[in-house]
Amino acid sequence: MAIGTQHPQQGAFSPVEPETWKSAAFPLGAQVLSDTTTFAVYSKNAVRVLLEIYRAPMGEAAHFEYWLERGADNVWRAQLERVPHGTFYAFRCWGPNWPLSPEWQRGNSASGFISDVDANGNRFNPNKLLFDPYARELSHDRETPAMKESFHHNAGMYGSGPDFYSGIDNRHPPVVRRAFDTGPWAPKSVVVQDRTDTGTKPRIQQKDAAIYE
């Protein structure tokens, strides 16, 4: 199945009017509306941005995926139907130093690679999952006790370059670091629907009010 097409066509998590995403003005981050959720992330130099939805914060590959559309303001956007509070999501980005290749797949692929960093400082790497800088909540830290004790991985996976990564005490087969897919392990952004109850504004007559500093 082609990258970016693994998602429902109707109902929960289905795209809502994708033909309008390029001209939309959704604010940055994930915004929960009445029946839909909008996603928006800024990148001037990215050439493709993939939104991924996860069922668990750690240990699983992405469940759904969507290509975001770039607006004239260099903000990449999408709108999905009925994305519930607490949903985990993240992004993968391609850029001038690592353009999208039809052969690229999740799971330690180097397809499309040109350089770890180019003359303009671009360091795009689709194998390194990115959380939303405007997320209201993250699922976990870059390195957790569970990651180390149960899965024998550490934060060394997030690096790039030609050397090899093989986990803690070389428990895993060595993989060129730039190609190691951090998707199952990286921190995920969390969709948060603000349900904060601010209460009812007190109505106190002026003669009974007190000013406190």
Q: Where are the regions a protein language model picked out?
A:
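Beta-strand signatures of extracellular beta-sandwich domains
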Residues: 50-52, 90
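The feature marks proteins involved in alpha-glucan
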Residues: 2-34, 73-75, 82-213
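Short, surface-exposed loop motifs enriched in S/T, G, D/E and P with embedded aromatic residues
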Residues: 64-71, 78
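Structural beta-strand segments of beta-rich domains
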Residues: 35-39
